[in-house]
Design a protein with these regions (language model features):
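Intrinsically disordered, low-complexity regulatory segments
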Residues: 1-139, 148, 209, 218-221, ...
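Basic, low-complexity terminal or inter-domain segments flanking catalytic cores
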Residues: 2-4, 15, 150, 160, ...
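Structured, non-catalytic alpha/beta "coupling" segments that mediate domain-domain communication
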Residues: 14-37, 168-215, 383-432, 588
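C-terminal or mid-to-C-terminal helical accessory/interaction module adjacent to the motor/catalytic core
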Residues: 112-194, 244
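Metal- or metallocofactor-binding catalytic centers and their adjacent structured scaffolds
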Residues: 215-252, 441
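Short acidic, hydrophobic short linear motifs in intrinsically disordered regions
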Residues: 238-241, 250-263, 290-299, 457-469
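Short, hydrophobic-biased segments on the C-terminal half of alpha helices
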Residues: 275-279, 485-486
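A short, conserved structural fragment
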Residues: 282-297, 491-500
Length: 694
């Protein structure tokens, strides 16, 4: 008889089955098989918060099949993912199949390759009860908060709403940022720039200080003009010249959070889209010449550790592709910020076979998986390459009673940047390409220009910056970031506006109520401490039941007080105004949020029940018919697309966003795809890079 190996998915089963051969039967549980009941609390609060698990609806036949296979197998091994959720799935499987959780029937694979599977199978272990209890504690806490708090929101705000231990904090961060933007008062300032000539070349230096070294930043046009007047007839002389060298180091290989952030910035992926592609790469794809294999190590990790074997493989590739000079001459190590012992058991996210290049893989895979593999592979390889070496120069130019400054650098050795550089959300400080200069050199003033500027409010969060904020504040865990963002958007608390996350009126109303009645639930520091307590459960330093009880006692008291405070009261969510008029009665229409998203409703409801689909005019004109306006719409799955308003006669649609810039060749609306703008008019073919912002 063969041994039975149970994993989560058919794809993973297929890949592992290839390596194990005929002595093993590999089958899939299709994810979780048991959970808390959907229709009731399912937790015995009076008896140690004991969860009352039931089989998930629709899994009865699968469970029966698994029991039959286990009964006739020569042993059972549980090979679910090496994390909290995977441990929980294995615990429930052991429970249903009658396996002793203390026996060595649990195996894990950090990478699904021949080597990784062999390594995992050689080290079976008992189920990690601390890891399972950490998952169980989170599940129980989330159920208690959701099940107790959601009905309160239904009564006081609107039916169908939900609140969560972590999602509510995420909404608060987004709402707090919106308040900062609304309350921001811009300050005027002026930049004074001198374009200076040195021989046939010129460069720009900016006013920095007065003669005494006091920083100068004119606050008005009058101040700027006074400085210009003081510079009339002045000589511009190089008064200080500093030369130096600097080394720029690569960023480490990805962890879950940085993978999600970089995929958002570089590829435009949502966190959910990133993790879906990463799961596919981990579980296995069919690669020409290799068959089914996992292309990356496990993608839910907080660890920056890289195995010596992987480092050696990377350096071997770098030497062959770039030369010995491009290999980092020492062993790079990065300190893992906050990983628990269980999390640090994994490596960082890296290619499972470093010598397998993206170009070779691209012959077998495409789309999101190909793009993500290229990014993971490049980042890992770059992390083992030599520093980028730069010569730096900074110059101070004195004129009358003022000092101007400029700085620049020259790359003397590209190092890791020959392969990869991290994308960034912040605008980098501009550095000028300076001509050769000497101390005491007199420069020619070519232009003196003053430009009005205003301080800018903080930017709205993107998925990347929200994930970064959640991580920095210790809110949630990287594996939960994708579902958190999906949930707050699906619930109508937050919406995407040009990749920025903006709170809706509903989201702001709910956040205000939560802040007023349950301040600890949405308190960032409280939530971070809760995560630390749960990490202690995972590392065996705290009892999960006591951790839950410590939270629940305070939460229950807050809920009782909130019911008293809000007795007879209800929070009114203001309707969002629109420019549309009701076709039935002529009253203005307002934007409401329903089960399937936003729609237009007559402000005269309930006297008038007029409704319309909500569409947004992009300002662009259809490139196909040349007449209809381009409208923003949503697919049945909630994805935004753009189509012609004359949809009964014109079938033009695209996922790519129209922009204000017009085609230089034919004058049509341009569309953005990645880093380029293109014209969609048949026969035109015009393309251009996306213009850079100052």
């Amino acid at each position: 008889m063969a041994k039975l190996v149970i994993v989560e998915s058919p794809a993973k089963a297929k890949t592992i089955g290839k390596y194990l051969g005929d002595d093993y039967e590999v089958t899939a549980s299709m994810g979780h098989i048991r959970d808390l009941p959907a229709s009731q609390l399912g937790i015995d609060v009076e008896h140690g918060y004991t969860p009352q698990y039931i089989s998930i609806k629709g899994k009865e036949k699968l469970i029966k099949e698994l029991k039959s296979k286990a009964k006739h197998a020569d042993g059972v091994l549980l090979a679910t993912d090496p994390d909290r959720e995977g441990e929980a799935i294995s615990w429930h499987l052991a429970n249903i199949l009658g396996l002793d959780p203390h026996e060595p029937n649990r195996v894990t694979f950090d990478e699904i390759t021949k080597k990784g599977v062999k390594e995992g199978m050689a080290h079976p272990r008992a189920i990690d009860e601390d890891l399972f209890n950490a998952q169980q504690a989170r599940r129980v806490l989330d159920r208690l908060v959701g099940y107790k708090l959601s009905p309160f929101l239904w009564r006081k705000v609107r039916r169908g709403l939900s609140a969560g231990r972590v999602q509510s904090v995420a909404v608060r961060l987004i709402d707090d940022r919106e308040k900062e933007i609304e309350n921001f008062k811009p300050d005027e300032y002026w930049n004074v720039d001198a374009t200076l000539g040195a021989g046939h070349k010129s460069f720009v230096a900016r006013l920095a200080t007065d003669a005494n070294g006091k920083k100068l930043l004119p606050k008005s046009e009058a101040e700027a003009r006074a400085i210009e007047k003081g510079l009339e007839g002045a000589s511009y002389v190089v008064s200080e010249l500093k030369r130096g060298k600097r080394a720029k180091q690569p960023t480490p290989a990805f962890i879950t959070s940085t993978l999600q952030q970089e995929a958002s910035r570089r590829l435009g992926f949502t966190a959910t889209r990133t993790m879906r592609a990463a799961q596919t790469l981990y579980e296995g794809v069919d690669i020409a010449g290799h068959g089914m294999m996992g292309l990356i190590t496990y993608m839910r990790t907080d660890s920056l550790r890289i195995s010596d074997e992987a480092v050696a493989a990377a350096k071997e590739y770098i030497a062959g592709a770039y030369g010995e000079a491009y290999i980092c001459p020492y062993k790079r190590t990065w300190k893992t910020k906050s990983a628990t012992a269980a999390q640090d058991a994994h490596e960082a996210i890296r290619p499972s076979v470093p010598s397998l290049t993206p170009d070779e893989v691209d012959k077998s895979i495409s789309g999101d998986t190909a793009k993500l593999y290229r990014m993971i592979w490049s980042r890992f390889m770059a992390s083992q390459m030599a520093d980028c070496q730069q010569d730096t120069v900074s110059v101070t130019v004195s004129a009358a009673d003022y000092h101007f400054k400029a700085s620049g650098y020259t790359v003397t050795f590209d190092g890791f940047t020959a392969l990869y550089e991290e994308a960034t959300d912040e605008k980098e400080k501009k550095e000028t390409n300076l001509p050769p200069l000497e101390q005491g050199q007199v420069l020619k003033l070519r232009e003196l220009k003053s430009e009005q500027k205003f301080t800018q409010p903080p930017a709205r969060y993107t998925e990347a910056t929200l994930i970064k904020a959640l991580e920095e504040n210790g809110i949630g865990r990287p594996s939960t970031y994708a579902p958190i963002i999906t949930t707050i958007i699906d619930r109508g608390y937050v919406e995407r506006d040009q990749k920025k996350l903006k709170p809706t009126l509903l989201g702001r109303a709910v956040d205000g109520l939560m802040l007023e009645q349950f301040p600890h639930i949405v308190d960032v520091d409280f939530s971070a401490q809760m995560e630390k307590n749960l990490d202690k459960v995972e590392s065996g330093k705290a009892d999960w039941r006591k951790t839950v009880d410590d939270f629940y006692q305070g939460f229950e008291a807050s809920l009782e007080q909130a019911e008293k405070n809000m007795e007879g009261k209800k929070v009114k969510v203001p309707d969002e105004p629109s420019s549309e008029v009701c076709d039935l009665c002529g009253r203005p229409m307002v934007i409401k949020v329903g089960k399937y998203g936003k729609f237009l409703a007559c402000s005269g409801f309930p006297e008038c029940r007029g409704t319309k689909r909500l569409v947004k005019d992009t300002g662009g004109i259809c490139p196909k018919c040349g007449k209809g306006r381009l409208l923003e719409r949503k697919s049945s799955k909630g994805r935004i697309y753009y189509g012609c308003e004359c949809y009964s006669d014109c079938d033009f649609m695209t996922w790519d966003m129209p922009v204000a810039t017009k085609c230089e060749k034919c004058g049509s609306t341009l569309f953005r795809k990645g880093g380029k703008l293109y014209c969609a008019k048949e026969g035109c073919g015009f393309e251009m890079p996306v213009p850079k912002k100052d």
